[in-house]
Curated annotation (Swiss-Prot):
GO terms for biological process: regulation of glutamine family amino acid metabolic process. The lineage of its organism: Bacteria, Pseudomonadati, Pseudomonadota, Gammaproteobacteria, Enterobacterales. Involved in the regulation of glutamine synthetase GlnA, a key enzyme in the process to assimilate ammonia. When cellular nitrogen levels are high, the C-terminal adenylyl transferase (AT) inactivates GlnA by covalent transfer of an adenylyl group from ATP to specific tyrosine residue of GlnA, thus reducing its activity. Conversely, when nitrogen levels are low, the N-terminal adenylyl removase (AR) activates GlnA by removing the adenylyl group by phosphorolysis, increasing its activity. InterPro entries: GlnE, GlnE_rpt_dom, NT_sf, PII_UdlTrfase/GS_AdlTrfase. Residues 1-440 are annotated as: Adenylyl removase. GO terms for cellular component: cytosol. The gene is glnE. Keywords: ATP-binding, Magnesium, Multifunctional enzyme, Nucleotide-binding, Nucleotidyltransferase, Transferase. This is Bifunctional glutamine synthetase adenylyltransferase/adenylyl-removing enzyme. CDD domains: NT_GlnE_GlnD_like. Its EC number is 2.7.7.89, 2.7.7.42. It comes from Escherichia coli O17:K52:H18 (strain UMN026 / ExPEC).
Length: 946
């Protein structure tokens, strides 16, 4: 323990003079001298109750002793027979335990987190004990309050603020809300009372017991102003009245307050769970909610003005960088995202701050600085208050109390303490300003050119716009004005509340100043106004763009680059959330991490809620698609990587859909009993075409077939027993249903299962043996071609190995070259007649001669032709690596393979970019002439001349 500083050693002599006989100096430990010198509250208390000091020295405070508070208090109240006795015992108990907490805190015997826990638990113990004693007394006097079924009704108490969060400070008010479950009246009393009357009277008595000063002091100052309607509202409300109020009239600051609400006492009872479930939707919105930022900013502005008005300087709670700003930072994330991130729904600040860091909503460095600052400030606040058990957050101006705080905070002197304090508060202020801003940051709004506001609000004529639109052509200027006018007319048809109008009037001048600075202003504005029309009645999305200038800039650049992205954002505004973090927006998920990220994403949704699961799958896909497209546009992803990401994403989706379908089927029917003898599920999904070949585009459908290895005699082992093969058929049907069901977020993927044996006429799911037999004995050459680009995208190792063996066996069959050449060429000519040359003077990149399909047919032909001699050709299912294999195995010259690869990737890159522009896959006839000529020559060489 650090020795007392010089000023405190001098003060100790004053303390000694006050001590009574039983507390002679020589009987005191060094610890006792330190605490008595530091805290006048402890000093006064032990002078009045010397036995407390004896107890402290023989049984020092422990970190976990809060667990005994209830038992200790129960013993203290065991002989209480009237309200006066109750009040006296509660006050003495509170003072005795507060002395123990002050002792532990001054000497740093336990952590600051433990101090906060002890202070909060003490308050809860006292509140609950007082409530329970009074409830019994009131029931004896007036009867027991019951509902219509005759069930006893309890009084539930919501602890708000720091009490609710388990973070009560040393000398604090307690904010409470009283509630009771159902209407009814008392039973068993001398006269019948309505439940509302019973609980109102009981509530009044409870406040008096806790709050009224007596010769023993008070227990806690009780503040009931956070209840619905404040001081003018009923003291106690029924659950129904509470629900009505918060649904119809609950304000933003009440949501802010309710984040920390905690039910005192038995928080796991039926009524407690009912109350908690009722309040949760009000506090945590299911959708991301950015309206809270302005509300919190307004509240912070009010507090800042109050600080200035009351001349509050050196206030570690309300001042810049103080405790309140840390609380605001944490609650911004809770209120914005808490509905979708259960880890943010904690009432306590430090666990929530850890969750914020874990979700990467704040950098690790910022989160750690806030954590350290919070613990520093809370310790300083509690020490300050424990000097005199006084509710203050203002640093002292007198030398004695400054010396006390410097010593207790482990600093040599006051300047060192204030220096460290300044560092912490500066760190907090920086994070706060970056996130929430404040009145002082509104100068940007004031400095925004008045002309942009006029352009938005005053519907300027073209002549008036010259200064801001001078760089645009006359046609573009006219178009911009028309777009603004049309957008305003569209707004007049919509129901937009005053808040929505206010946000739009703030957003649009900023948006116009950014958009109209671009050369392509008219095109970009047309895409963005189309998006805005879809979200104007949903103020929370407007607020996102208004509050986060970086998000607005990303929106503008992405919409300018791609109408596909603009359409996606307009259709699914939930995706706007992705614009907030450029680190993730332009950095798609690592290719091997999609499955894990999706699994984590789905953990937020109840497994048994199919509708939410389907919605979550679609939302995840769209968010990932946006990130891939953003990286594509930014040039950070080459074409091959774009397809890799789209393919990995699809595989993650298949994995999740099969998992969902499997769980649903097993719940209904049990598992096929042959699985008892083997690992895995006996089921595989095979991807063909673009999926099999790692070549998916932005809007590609999935070519899938389903395989199982279920014996004929297998049955399921559930209560509803069905044939094992029937189980797998229903599983496949369920998978198709989950992919194609249209929710508010659209469908997941179009799935085409017609490549299965016998096509649309065949069974949806095929046994592995039947598949092998079909491929050997019935399949056409084009089906063997399709097999070149096929691979298992979901399945257990046994079935995967079986499919790979069948594929290898079929592809390595000896084939007569001329016959194969003719069959492949004729199939291609049929396709070209059916799909190609539909656009006169245009080149269809995929279907026309010299396009992508020709390259695919060349590689498929060469694999089928030569795999018998060179089995290594069967290794890969994508065209680029097949071309590499053809060169490595001396079938195609390396120069030709590389040239075809370049042509192939160039054409695919163009298809990706046309998709981003929402344009069809054809271009002018004079495009890609060199690539097409190269492909034609290769086609001639391999499929015509040989």
């Amino acid at each position: 323990m650090k020795p007392l500083s010089s000023p405190l050693q001098q003060y100790w002599q004053t303390v000694v003079e006050r001590l009574p006989e039983p507390l002679a100096e020589e009987s005191l430990s060094a610890q006792a001298k330190s605490v008595l010198t530091f805290s006048d509250f402890v000093q006064d208390s032990v002078i009045a109750h010397p036995e407390w000091l004896t107890e402290l020295q023989s049984q020092p405070p422990q970190a976990d002793e809060w667990q005994h508070y209830a038992a200790w208090l129960q013993e203290a109240l065991s002989n209480v027979s009237d309200e006066a006795g109750l009040m006296r015992e509660l006050r003495l108990f509170r003072r005795r335990i507060m002395v123990r907490i002050a002792w532990a805190q001054t000497l740093a015997l336990v952590t600051e987190e433990s101090i906060l826990q002890q202070l909060s638990h003490l308050a809860e113990t006292l509140i609950v004990a007082a409530r329970d004693w009074l409830y019994d007394a009131c029931c004896r006097e007036w009867g027991t309050p019951c509902n219509a079924q005759g069930e006893a009704q309890p009084l539930l108490i919501l602890g708000m603020g720091k009490l609710g969060g388990g973070e009560l400070n040393f000398s604090s008010d307690i904010d409470l809300i009283f509630a009771w479950p159902e209407h009814g009246c008392t039973q068993g009393g001398r006269r019948e009372l309505d439940n509302a009357q019973f609980f109102t009277r009981m509530g009044q008595r409870l406040i008096k017991v806790l709050d009224q000063p007596t010769q023993d002091g008070f227990v806690y100052r009780v503040d009931m102003r956070l209840r619905p309607f404040g001081e003018s509202g009923p003291l106690v409300l029924s659950f129904a009245a509470l629900e009505d109020y918060y649904q119809e009239q609950g304000r933003d600051w009440e949501r802010y307050a309710m984040v920390k609400a905690r039910i005192m006492g038995d928080s796991e009872g039926v009524y407690a769970n009912e109350l908690r479930a009722m309040l949760r939707p009000f506090v945590f919105r299911r959708y991301i909610d950015f309206s809270v930022i302005q509300s919190l900013r307004n509240m912070k502005g009010m507090i800042a003005r109050e600080v200035r008005r009351r001349g509050l300087t050196d206030n570690i709670k309300l001042g810049a960088g103080g405790i309140r700003e840390i609380e605001f930072i944490v609650q911004v994330f809770q209120l914005i995202r808490g509905g979708r991130e259960p880890s943010l729904q904690s009432r306590s600040l430090l666990p929530t701050l850890s969750a914020i860091a874990a979700l990467h909503l704040l950098s690790e460095n910022d989160a750690e600085q806030l954590r350290v600052a919070y613990l520093f400030l809370r310790r300083l606040e509690n020490l300050l208050q424990s000097i005199n058990d006084e509710q203050t957050q203002t640093l002292p101006s007198d030398e004695l109390n400054r010396a006390r705080l410097a010593w207790a905070m482990d600093f040599a002197d006051w300047p060192q303490l204030t220096g460290a304090l300044t560092v912490h508060m500066t760190n907090v202020r920086r994070v706060f300003n970056e996130l929430i801003g404040d009145d002082e940051s509104e100068t940007q709004e004031e400095s925004l050119s008045e002309q942009w506001r006029e352009l938005w609000q005053d519907a300027l004529q073209e002549d008036d716009t010259t200064p801001v639109l001078a760089h645009l052509s006359e046609d573009d200027r006219k178009q911009v004005l028309t777009l603004i006018a049309d957008f305003r007319k569209e707004l007049d048809k919509r129901t937009i509340g005053p808040r929505g109008r206010q946000v739009l009037d703030h957003l649009m001048p900023h948006l116009l100043s950014d958009v109209c600075a671009r050369e392509d202003a008219a095109v970009t504005l047309s895409r963005i106004t189309a998006l805005l029309v879809g979200i104007v009645t949903r103020t929370t999305y407007l607020e996102l763009l208004s509050e986060f200038p970086a998000a607005l800039k990303h929106l503008i650049s992405l919409c300018a680059a791609s109408p596909m992205i603009a359409s996606q954002l307009a259709r699914y505004p939930l995706l706007l959330d992705e614009l907030l973090d450029p680190n993730t927006l332009y950095q798609p998920t690592a290719t091997d991490a999609y499955r894990d990220e999706l699994r984590q994403y789905l953990l937020r949704v109840p497994e048994d809620d199919e509708e939410q699961q389907l919605e979550a799958l679609r939302q995840f896909k769209q968010a990932q698609l946006l990130r891939i497209a953003a990286a594509d546009i930014a040039g950070t992803l080459p074409v091959m990587k774009v397809s890799d990401h789209l393919t990995w994403l699809a595989e993650a989706m298949i994995d999740a859909v099969v998992q969902q379908a499997w769980v649903q089927m097993v719940v209904r029917y049990g598992k096929p009993n042959h699985l008892n003898e083997r690992e895995g599920r006996g089921f595989a999904v095979v991807g063909y075409g673009k999926l099999g070949g790692w070549e998916l585009g932005y809007s590609s459908d999935l070519d899938l077939i389903f395989l199982h290895d279920c014996p004929m005699d297998a049955m399921t082992d559930g209560e509803r027993e069905i044939d094992g093969r029937q189980f797998y058929l229903r599983l496949a049907q369920r998978i198709m249903h989950l992919f194609s069901t249209r929710t508010s977020s659209g469908i997941l993927y179009e799935v085409d299962a017609r490549l299965r044996p016998s096509g649309a006429a065949g069974m949806l799911v095929t046994s592995a043996e039947a598949f092998a037999d079909y491929q050997k004995n019935e399949a056409w050459t084009w089906e063997h071609q399709a097999l070149v680009r096929a691979r298992v995208v979901y399945g257990d190792p046994q079935l995967t190995a079986h499919f790979d063996a069948v594929r290898r066996e079929i592809m390595t069959l000896p084939r007569e070259g001329k016959t194969l050449q003719t069959e492949v060429r004729e199939m291609r000519e049929k396709m070209r007649a059916h799909l190609g040359n539909k656009h006169r003077d245009r080149f269809d990149i995929k279907a026309d001669e010299g396009g992508i399909t020709d390259i695919e047919f060349i590689t498929q032909y060469l694999v089928l032709r030569y795999a018998h001699e060179k089995p290594k050709l069967t290794r890969w299912s994508d065209n680029v690596r097949i071309l590499e294999l053809l060169a490595q195995n001396d079938i195609m010259e390396e120069q030709e393979a590389m040239a075809l690869t370049r042509a192939y990737t160039t054409l695919r890159d163009e298809l990706h970019h046309l998709a981003l522009q929402e344009l069809p896959g054809h271009v002018s006839e004079d495009c890609f002439t060199a690539e097409r000529e190269l492909v034609r020559a290769s086609w001639q060489k391999w499929l015509v001349e040989e």
